[in-house]
Regions:
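Structured loop/turn residues at beta-strand edges in well-structured enzyme cores
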Residues: 27, 48, 77
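Catalytic metal-binding acidic patch
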Residues: 33-69, 81-87
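Residue-level preference for long, well-ordered alpha-helices that form the structural scaffold
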Residues: 6-10, 63, 218, 225
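Helical scaffold of the NTase/Pol beta-like nucleotidyltransferase catalytic core
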Residues: 1-33
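Conserved nucleotidyltransferase catalytic core and NTase-mimicking acidic/glycine-rich helix/loop elements
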Residues: 14, 114, 121, 125-245
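Conserved NTP/Mg2+-binding pocket subregion across the NTase superfamily
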Residues: 3, 9, 65-158
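Long, highly charged amphipathic alpha-helices
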Residues: 13-20, 66-69, 228
């Protein structure tokens, strides 16, 4: 959605980068977007980067070579390396990355050019297939991550905290797949998922508190979180596996 209000501090941080892009290379640009947490209440300027998508008329590797040295300067200012795409790439990749494109469609702010994502069509069959695959991948990752932590509380806690953000795009996609409008903020995503599926997501709320440095759980508590995490993803996987079959 391009009608989202852009906070002044976000605009102030991103505009110098945008000016560099447009000053000499505007003719290469189809459109530029800010995406992700910078558009939500979850954004924390102390730890969050500003993510963006740059759509070029055609992929230009020389342009990327010119832009690369600027990464250090703007990276220190909290500007993450953008995703670069072309209209043709977007059109040809919707079936491969429906979750990613759905999340961009749901949460973007156009800062330059014509909004190519607003009316982007995401096929529900493609979305269901990727949701099912991603849930299975999450289960593999949970098993491997838990064992590789080797009983180290700090490693396990860090692993859970670092993994949290990767679940939110998937959960938003599941909410949309099940026919509902997805919220944009993490606590609302979790509560909506519970309301729709009946699957409790308390473990993810606990990890969100851990991620926000509000708790310091014991190893016993982390073991319970692991079990609950696994059960949630397993139940969601079974639900999506049976969806529309």
């Amino acid at each position: 959605m391009s009608g989202l209000n852009l906070k002044a501090d976000i605009a102030d941080r991103y505009n110098p980068f945008l000016e560099v892009l447009l000053e000499e290379h505007q003719n290469k640009m189809h459109s530029v977007y800010i995406v992700g947490s910078a558009l939500t209440r979850d954004y924390d300027p102390k730890i969050s980067d500003i993510n963006s998508v740059i759509v070029l008329h055609e992929m230009d590797l020389k342009f990327l070579e010119m832009l690369a040295p600027l990464g250090r300067k703007f990276g220190k200012q909290g500007i993450a390396a953008p995703l670069f795409m072309t209209p043709a790439y977007i059109d040809n990749s919707r079936d491969v990355f429906p979750i990613e494109f759905l999340n961009i469609k749901l949460l973007h702010h156009t800062v330059f050019g014509q909004d190519i994502f607003r009316d982007l069509d995401i096929d529900r069959a493609d979305l269901r297939h990727q949701c099912e695959r991603e849930l299975k991948v999450k289960l593999i990752g949970l098993r491997q991550g838990y064992v590789s932590a080797a009983g180290d509380r700090k490693i396990l806690a860090t692993g859970f905290a670092d993994s949290f953000a990767g679940y939110m795009p998937l959960f938003k996609a599941i909410i949309v797949l099940l026919g509902h409008e997805s919220p944009q903020n993490n606590p609302d995503i979790l509560s909506t998922l519970t309301d729709i599926t009946g699957i409790r997501t308390d473990a993810f709320n606990q990890v969100l508190a851990l991620k926000n440095r509000q708790t310091k759980p014991t190893m016993e508590k982390l073991n319970l979180v692991f079990e609950d995490y696994y059960e949630i993803i397993e139940q969601l996987g079974e639900m999506i596996n049976a969806f529309d079959k």
